[in-house]
């Protein structure tokens, strides 16, 4: 039989204050600092909105990490807190005890709410915010500096989530007093006019990750370019399934030139991902030459590129230190792979991930990339499935990986000799050929996680993943 621990005196004191909201409100200014967190959590869990409104006005810490306490925003709770902040921001003389500089609506730091009471006697909590956002990303702190509200935003639908809509309206009405800082912004299906409205409210210099999906490239470039130019702290930029409906190559070139000029301002960019790359076919160099910062991650996927596009990849210093290169499902079977081989040689000392899945590379092209690939000593992940390889070409490829001792996950296609007229695997032929390939590989090194053939495996259902220790079908 377990004995439940008696409530702490602090908990009892907080519960006593909350029984009479008028008493708790009048006591806020003189409330001991050590009581503030437990009392706030109690008021929050019981939804004592009036108490929350007053508590936020005398908040004794620099940050209120509400997002880690409220996983999903609750409209009435949000209104209560913002009402308290409104009353505070409109006062000429702010309370002596008030220290709040950041309202954080992200799920950042659960430890904040678990460390009371002792740790808070000396803490003013600047640490959590600095881990996710540096001081240069948002306006400088100081007396009567704008209050910063941090939130990660995902725009999925119209009408918008009512909490987000209320927050946008609240911030817009207090321009100059509040900055809405969004470190990560994702736009799924929201029409471009609503995305523009959001960008007019968000403090653009705070955005570190931006993902835009399912938009027209011409409209995106014309309507959003002016906003992208102001995102000077952008680290990750993703365009997914953005399409185009023009066959005018000259017009495309002008649009790409306008779009590329944006990158002259993005001095901190580390990741660039474009899914459906065809819009840039024949114009990729315009974009690459405008990159100011050496990228760590480049993903250009789905579609096709010309040989001139591939050549530019090895010619600019911004791509000289890549750690991750993904060209999956970019059709490469009609062009020379010598430029790709030159790029691999250039980035051999830094490259950790190489994804050439589904590029329809023919075994006659393979020799162009093998010297560069064999020098990628830091490579841990190599995806080469869904390419057109003979058994001899695959053996040659595997032998060239002998020096890749850090390789921990790799995929290869079934040799073409094992495919039937419908380009499906004939398992009677494939099984001994796969054993032959594994024997060739084990002669030069011991693999860790390897897939040869179709994925997911029809025999065991497994797919490439970091969790899979061994593909038993090999």
Curated annotation (Swiss-Prot):
One of its GO terms (cellular component) is Cul2-RING ubiquitin ligase complex. It comes from the Eukaryota. Keywords: Leucine-rich repeat, Repeat. GO terms for molecular function: ubiquitin-like ligase-substrate adaptor activity. The keyword Nucleotide-binding does not apply. LRR repeats lie at residues 97-124, 179-203, 204-230, 231-265, 266-291, 292-323, 324-342, 348-375, 376-400. One of its GO terms (biological process) is proteasome-mediated ubiquitin-dependent protein catabolic process. Belongs to the PRAME family. This is PRAME family member 1. It comes from Homo sapiens (Human). The lineage of its organism: Eukaryota, Metazoa, Chordata, Craniata, Vertebrata. The gene is PRAMEF1.
């Amino acid at each position: 039989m377990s004995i439940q621990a008696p409530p702490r005196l602090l908990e009892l004191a907080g519960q006593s204050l909350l029984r009479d909201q008028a008493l708790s409100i009048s006591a806020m200014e003189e409330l001991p600092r050590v009581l503030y967190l437990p009392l706030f959590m109690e008021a929050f869990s019981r939804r004592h909105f009036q108490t929350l409104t007053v508590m936020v006005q005398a908040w004794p810490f620099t940050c209120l990490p509400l997002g880690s306490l409220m996983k999903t925003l609750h409209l009435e709770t949000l209104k209560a807190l913002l009402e308290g902040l409104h009353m505070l921001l409109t006062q000429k003389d702010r309370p002596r005890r008030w220290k709040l500089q950041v309202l954080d609506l992200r799920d950042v730091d659960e430890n904040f709410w678990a460390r009371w009471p002792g740790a808070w006697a000396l803490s003013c909590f600047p640490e959590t915010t600095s881990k996710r956002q540096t001081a240069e990303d948002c306006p400088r702190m100081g007396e009567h500096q704008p209050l910063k509200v941090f939130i990660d935003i995902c725009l999925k639908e119209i009408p918008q989530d009512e909490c987000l809509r209320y927050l946008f309206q609240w911030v817009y009405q207090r321009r100059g007093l509040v900055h809405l800082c969004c470190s990560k912004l994702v736009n799924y299906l929201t029409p471009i006019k609503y995305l523009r409205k959001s960008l007019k409210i968000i403090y653009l210099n705070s955005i570190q990750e931006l993902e835009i999906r399912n938009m027209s490239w011409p409209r995106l470039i014309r309507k959003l370019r002016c906003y992208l130019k102001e995102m000077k702290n952008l680290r990750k930029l993703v365009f997914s399934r953005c399409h185009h409906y023009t066959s005018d190559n000259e017009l495309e070139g002008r649009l790409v030139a306008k779009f590329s000029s944006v990158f002259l301002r993005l001095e901190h960019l580390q990741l660039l991902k474009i899914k459906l790359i065809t819009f840039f076919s024949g114009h990729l160099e315009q974009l690459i030459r405008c990159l100011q910062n050496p990228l760590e991650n480049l993903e250009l996927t789905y579609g096709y590129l010309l040989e001139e596009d591939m050549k530019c990849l090895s010619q600019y210093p911004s791509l000289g230190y890549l750690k991750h290169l993904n060209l999956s499902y970019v059709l490469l079977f009609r062009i020379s792979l010598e430029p790709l081989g030159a790029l691999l040689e250039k980035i051999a000392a830094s490259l950790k991930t190489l994804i050439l899945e589904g590029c329809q590379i023919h075994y006659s092209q393979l020799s162009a990339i093998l010297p560069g690939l064999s020098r990628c000593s830091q490579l841990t992940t190599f995806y080469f499935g869904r390419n057109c390889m003979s058994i001899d070409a695959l053996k040659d490829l595997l032998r060239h990986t002998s020096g890749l001792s850090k390789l921990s996950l790799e995929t290869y296609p079934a040799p073409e000799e094992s495919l039937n007229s419908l380009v499906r695997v004939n398992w009677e032929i494939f099984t001994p050929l796969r054993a032959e390939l594994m024997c060739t590989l084990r002669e030069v090194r011991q693999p860790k996680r390897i897939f040869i053939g179709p994925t997911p495996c029809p025999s065991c259902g497994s797919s490439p993943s970091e969790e899979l220790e061994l593909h038993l079908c090999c």
